[in-house]
Amino acid sequence: MKRLWFIVGLFFCCISVQAEKRALIIGIGTYPDVDYGWPVIHGDNDIVFAKTMLVANGFKAGNIDTLRNEQASSHAIGEAFKRLIATAKTNDVVYIHFSGHGQQITDLDGDEEDGYDEAWVAYDALQEPTPNYHGEHHITDDQLNAWLKQLRQKVEINGRIIVVSDACHSGTSTRDITEPTEIRGAHSKFELNGIKRPYKEQRTIEWISISACADNECNRQHRLSDGKQCGSLTYALYLLRDNLSTIVADQLSALLNKTINELVKRPQTPLVELPNANNQYLFE
């Protein structure tokens, strides 16, 4: 009898640590008003494409958290990461997706060679400093790195973390009259004066990072047949959704490059940064 209960207990223990796929999708298209300095884009349209892509690759809808427009304040994004960290388990696959504006902001800890952090622009972030605003609502890569390190501790070495950024940190923030679609990003940097930065070693890569374009390029949106716009990176992943389970991670860059440049018809170089284990499948 004791042996039987031991086997039963072992069975339920194995079930309890079974790996799952979890995701957080953030999509911002409309920022509060013109005083915030951000023109309308269509990051909120990306949510349905990202979610469809994930479900096609084994993510349960109940394990996909979404924040749209006003739901995506800096506080709400932080709370969503806390929920993700709290529920993540050993060997889980965790996917994080941001579609919205991006901006370079003065680096405070010395880990960036050019002196600027890349930041996601939360719904309540301003484009320029004011006497009362110093970038508190920008989601800097330092903050993101802190959350991701906590996630890494939860999923451990064999877990998978994928971070997708369909934003732009160097593109113009206004509509280009020569382009049929808007461009995501801010032309101006968020400059904090009087900052002395300590030197800090650059971080090692502990997760798969996928960005829509190189730092010196613009992230152009794709116009759909119904006239709506969406992120070129998001839509490329959506188009590739049925193949992602069989794509080795280090093959993804070439496939995204080909797909995105067919969508936007202008040079745009998606970036895929990989940890050492780059010959594994993206979602497995």
Q: Residue locations for each model-derived region?
A:
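Cysteine endopeptidase catalytic domains of the caspase/legumain-like
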Residues: 18-284
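Hydrophobic h-region of N-terminal signal peptides that target proteins for export
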Residues: 5, 9-17
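Residue-level detector of intrinsically disordered/flexible regions characterized by low predicted structural confidence
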Residues: 4-5, 163
